[in-house]
A protein has these predicted regions:
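A short helix-loop-helix "switch/interaction" segment in the helical subdomain of ASCE P-loop NTPases
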Residues: 1-4
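C-terminal accessory/connector segments of nucleic-acid motor ATPases
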Residues: 35-39, 63, 76
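Amphipathic alpha-helical
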Residues: 31-46
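Peripheral, non-AAA+ core regions of ATP-driven protein-machinery
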Residues: 30, 48-53, 57-62, 69-217
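C-terminal helical "lid" of AAA+/P-loop NTPase domains
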Residues: 6-20
Length: 221
């Protein structure tokens, strides 16, 4: 389990400080450490978990990712400006992630008329796709559906729902392929206050391995 050794070290640190306080005060009491006291014993929080945005925004979608220490929320941003069809990709993105961006653009272009988007948008506008926390490398294909949604949102002006997270690889035909790390991703969504997560149909079978408290019974029907 990722982080268990670090957790053991932090617990040991709390125990040492409690023992020292008892020894210094010569008291003979039982000490109960609660969450409010953790900052006193361990200092200011070193990490923070991502939280869902409060407002729906155009061109911004909540994705999900898996890191070496568990799942995380992944913010996907898309901005369109007048230009000549240049696509800028930033956020320390790996090769597979960049290929996913290109696939998402092609999917949107192939369905532009159906979606109410100018079919020649790729000739008249520049796209900038960014994933914040640029110091953290990002890779993998599972952001495909989020990228498509962010692109459609920015090109139509329709805000994407901030309280909805999504994950899934997308093909050029618009099919959504299964992903890995579903448990970690759902845990990240749960921590972030997100109650609705869109997952590939083929990952439905993986829900049997997910703690029931993370999803309603409707999700497995």
């Amino acid at each position: 389990e990722a982080g268990v050794r670090g957790l053991e070290r932090e617990i040991a640190k709390v125990c040492r400080k409690v023992v020292r306080e008892i020894a210094e005060t010569h008291s003979n009491i039982t000490v109960e450490v609660n969450t409010e006291q953790l900052e006193h014993y361990l200092g200011v929080k070193k990490f923070r978990f991502g939280l869902a945005d409060d407002e729906d925004q155009v061109g911004q979608v909540t994705g999900l990712a898996v890191t070496s220490v568990g799942g995380e929320l992944l913010s996907i941003e898309a901005v369109v400006v007048p230009g000549k069809g240049v696509t800028v990709k930033t956020g320390s993105l790996g090769d597979v992630m960049q290929e996913s961006i290109q696939a998402a653009i092609t999917v949107v272009r192939s369905r532009a008329a159906y979606l109410g988007i100018d079919p020649s948008f790729h000739e008249k506008k520049d796209l900038h796709i960014h994933m914040p926390e640029g110091a953290t490398p990002k890779d993998g294909p599972s952001a495909g559906i989020g990228l498509c949604t962010a692109l459609v949102s920015v090109l139509t002006g329709i805000p994407a729902k901030a309280a909805v997270a999504m994950t899934g690889e997308i093909t050029l035909r618009g099919q959504v392929l299964p992903i890995g790390g579903l448990k970690e991703k759902l845990l990240a969504a749960h921590r972030g206050g997100i109650k609705t997560v869109l997952i590939p149909e083929e990952n439905r079978r993986d829900l049997k391995d997910i703690p029931c408290l993370l999803y309603t019974s409707d999700a497995a029907d």
